[in-house]
Amino acid sequence: MTPLERRSSISLALIFALRMLGLFLVLPVFALEARKYPGGDDPALVGLAMGIYGLTQAVLQLPLGMASDRFGRKRVIVLGPLVFAAGSLLAALADSLTGLLVGRALQGAGAVSAAVTALLADQTRDAVRTKAMALVGGSIGLMFAVALVAAPVLTAHIGLAGLFGLTCALALAGVAVVLWWVPAESAQHRNAPRGSVADVWRNPDLLRLNLGVFVLHTVQLSMWVAVPAMLVQAGLTKDHHWQVYLPAVVLSFVAMGGLFAMERRGRLRGALLGAIALVLLVQVGLGALAASGTTPTLWVLGPLMFLFFCGFNALEASQPSLVSRMAPAPVRGAALGSYNTLQSLGLFAGGALGGALVKWAGAPGLFATTAVLTALWLVLTWPLQPVGRNAGGGH
């Protein structure tokens, strides 16, 4: 990477990390802490308050991605953390579950993932873009692991309101990063001719990638409905689950070197298909374990979590990299907005699907469904065309 590419990658990854740390700190404790608020005895309302963030984010990803094409990436990126901070402050000051719900909805309105990834694509060459995207994905995975360890400790001292206050402070720190560290946009991007969002939806390979991120996050969130219970059955109490997740996440980052090697050899499509197959293998393994009737063991669950994070992190890096290469530069923000919209909808669908499947079909039925979804995804992605280094009018 050049110094400019390195600065852009690190600063934009930090923006993601600050935002996602705030989100992840709240998630492990939200359902329990929300019960202490008036209205918190309604499980449906608690679930809505948790999920409303993903819904408002999904609605606004595409419009804000298109706005970044028209008005500039950094303007939109500054706006996002400010809105997110306002939502966090509202949630911190809330005295009822309804107030928490409104705050969470406003948090989701700060949907800048598309603008951030579009700016990262603008400021990196195709040859190093997957590495840059992996830095963003890795920062998110690391924040997830940190939050699993820190959330229970922080909640015991500052409560849910304090966590939202901390989230607000992290978001404002993100604004400072945008203003004083993220490199300026190039005149080439600001003066580029504008394209049509229809160009995005007419591209079959972009549609495959959009479908892919929807399935990936549907499967991912569905998994977490059942996996924690399996870890408890294996003898690991809830406050020690990080002892499985943290090593799995960290070791999966080491395995990312293989992805970069395949990218350098022009085999990113092969890496993508291999990662999907890895996620499929994990779903089959978890399903077989759940259906066997035997007590799960950490010696089986630990390696399965490692394999899942290897596949998940590879897909989180390679898919947006491919979107940015395939999309014409004038509609790159719209393309990544569409991609992030489907990602958010996948998170929303995964929570709903996972809960319903565990209730009506148990863990074996859940993993059978996620395995079928992943297998269909692999089949539909197989015709994906190899991408040249200069596709999409890259940097």
Label every model-predicted segment.
Residues 1-5, 182-212:
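Juxtamembrane intracellular "pre-TM" segments in multi-pass secondary transporters
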Residues 59-95:
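Conserved MFS/SLC helix-loop-helix module at the cytosolic interface between two early adjacent transmembrane helices
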Residues 103-140:
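Cytoplasmic helix-loop-helix junction between adjacent transmembrane helices
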Residues 60-72, 254-268, 358:
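Helix-to-loop junctions at the C-terminal end of transmembrane segments
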Residues 75-89, 168, 270-285, 371:
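Structural signature of the two symmetry-related core transmembrane helices
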